[in-house]
């Protein structure tokens, strides 16, 4: 029985290769007939890897890391070549050179950097006062900038001030250079409205008030400004008093005033006078202090109450 069982077991389950003789183990396998060639199918072969893990096939385009591309990127990074050329988008073909330092720089950025940066780093970093240069989208970097603003920030280049009509806040005048607080930009070729047409003075076209004095020298009132200064910040108002009499006009209390100074006329203080119901009058008053006070410190000085009794 044992021999029969061993024979059955050997027929059904062959012994492992190590028990065979050496000649049987090293004999070559019998050759099989070649299989017929598979017919080409339209469906692509199915890959074993998932689709989201497959690597994209390399395109036949040249490598992006060529020497020319690397050199061009280096030039853009150093600032020798502008990163955003306004000639491509601008409507009025603004020339781009080293003197264009008050431009907004890159379009559509809110990066805060200093004004008047050197030309080598000018193109790489946008300025703090970006007003939607080169036809930016409505809103641009500053709310309220229209699409027509083409990059004449500060009145350096022509374009924006002829279109926006003073709707762009903070654009400086090419005469007073934005030193007059609260003066909007105008359409006189980069001149603010008060520089182009002050109160009581008729100017020729494109003539600025700084070219001639408004009043004769050494006369009381706002005439004490030296000729050649910007007179846009000195409105003619009957409340103005000559120097040395009073720093503030009569009838104005501390709660009704907002005093601020201008570097264009350091000895002139501006007072916003609120009259009911909703009228604001800008009054220029001479002060005894000729030191310039920056806008951050424009707090009105305490007024002395008159002695009673």
From Swiss-Prot:
Residues 30-43, 297-309 have a biased composition (Pro residues). Residues 58-67 have a biased composition (Basic and acidic residues). Residues 1-94, 286-309 are annotated as: Disordered. This is Uncharacterized protein J1L. It comes from Human cytomegalovirus (strain AD169).
């Amino acid at each position: 029985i044992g021999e029969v069982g061993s024979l059955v077991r050997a027929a059904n389950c062959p012994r492992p290769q190590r028990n065979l003789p050496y000649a049987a183990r090293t004999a070559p396998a019998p050759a099989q007939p070649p299989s017929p060639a598979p017919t080409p199918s339209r469906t692509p072969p199915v890959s074993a890897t998932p689709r989201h893990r497959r690597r994209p096939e390399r395109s036949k385009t040249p490598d992006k890391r060529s020497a020319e591309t690397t050199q061009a990127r280096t030039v853009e990074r150093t600032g020798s070549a502008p990163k955003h050329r306004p000639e491509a988008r601008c409507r009025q073909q603004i020339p781009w050179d080293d003197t264009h330092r008050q431009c907004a720089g890159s379009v559509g950025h809110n990066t805060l950097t200093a004004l008047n940066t050197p030309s080598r780093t000018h193109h790489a970093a946008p300025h703090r006062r970006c007003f939607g240069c080169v036809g930016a989208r409505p809103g641009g970097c500053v709310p309220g900038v229209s699409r027509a603003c083409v990059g004449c920030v500060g009145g350096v280049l022509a374009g924006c001030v002829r279109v926006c009509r003073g709707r762009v806040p903070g654009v400086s005048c090419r005469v007073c250079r934005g030193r007059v607080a609260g003066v909007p930009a105008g359409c006189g070729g980069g001149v603010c409205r008060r520089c182009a047409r002050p109160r009581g003075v008729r100017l020729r076209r494109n003539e600025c008030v700084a070219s001639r004095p408004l009043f004769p020298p050494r006369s009381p009132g706002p005439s004490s400004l030296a000729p050649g200064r910007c007179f846009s910040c000195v409105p003619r108002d009957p409340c103005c008093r000559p120097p040395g009499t009073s720093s503030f006009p009569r009838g104005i209390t501390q709660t009704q005033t907002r005093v601020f100074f201008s570097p264009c006329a350091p000895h002139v203080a501006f007072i916003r006078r609120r009259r009911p119901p909703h009228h604001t009058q800008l009054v220029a008053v001479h002060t005894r202090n000729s030191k310039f006070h920056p806008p951050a410190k424009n707090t009105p000085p305490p007024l002395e109450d008159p002695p009673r009794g």
